[in-house]
């Protein structure tokens, strides 16, 4: 065995000796480290405080007043606005509606987006290497197109399509022999209004998240799929055992963003059903807030609604993180339970042979 003589280069790569007690020594603050933290931590933190925390604190303050918006005069009323809010039947109906949207829209959208992404990325011929379907780029553009159209335009287009007298949807259904839909009011029937609104929101968002998942799936090592294919795993089994665990963080992030969009959903709903629908069946908190502020000029009360909506959004995000952690998510779990470990072993054996 050849003896090696330590050089300056190898010596510089040696780990620094630990301090007493086994603790590593603290690195000294240098100009480079200070400027790095100021640029990449201090500036974003300052922006967050100025544009998020301070306005939110102001919103809490104005939510405790009877401010009318167009006057400098106001009175401090404490928690009266919040008490009034939870005694307001219309607000409670709006709260139930957004809870329904947050429960179904993310679930349906992500399920469809995952299906589209897997089909485009891994749905190619079963023979040969694992690859996407032919014309994947075309299908990716087509699926993404609804997201490119502004939400207000999407809402107005679908409002015309849902029109009971001259709408395209009723015309198509009637042409197929379903005469009961001749003058059916999709946005005027209590039982149909909310599902119709949900469909439009899902239609407008599913393409974006499909493209997001396509990018995430392409980051999964190809040898995992090849090894799973050698093991005899089908497409469904491969998707459940390899693809989903590998893109779990992307799914979690998408679920949070979709939940926030569903809890708001102001643009889509306001474009299609500006009056809140039959018996307020499609009314959202954002719509109620808008009407209270600008129609009744109760800006203090409306601001209190905004504070509650922000709190509900934070609770939703926290629940998503909690569920993900309890079901095995998180960085630590991903290191202990790496997806496709069996496939990795199979690939390693194949390479050794």
UniProtKB/Swiss-Prot annotation:
Q: In this protein, which residues make up the domain named ABC transmembrane type-1? A: 95-320
Per its UniProt record, what InterPro entries does this chain match?
ABC_transporter_permease, MetI-like, MetI-like_sf
Q: Name one Pfam family in it.
A: BPD_transp_1
One Gene Ontology BP term is: transmembrane transport
Quote the CDD domains the UniProt record gives. TM_PBP2
Q: Where is this region: Disordered?
A: 1-24, 329-353
Q: Which Gene3D superfamilies match?
A: MetI-like
The record, for PROSITE patterns, names: ABC_TM1
What quaternary structure, including any partners, is listed in this protein's UniProt entry? The complex is composed of two ATP-binding proteins (MsiK), two transmembrane proteins (NgcF and NgcG) and a solute-binding protein (NgcE).
Listed name of the protein = Diacetylchitobiose uptake system permease protein NgcF
Please tell me the species this chain comes from: Streptomyces coelicolor (strain ATCC BAA-471 / A3(2) / M145)
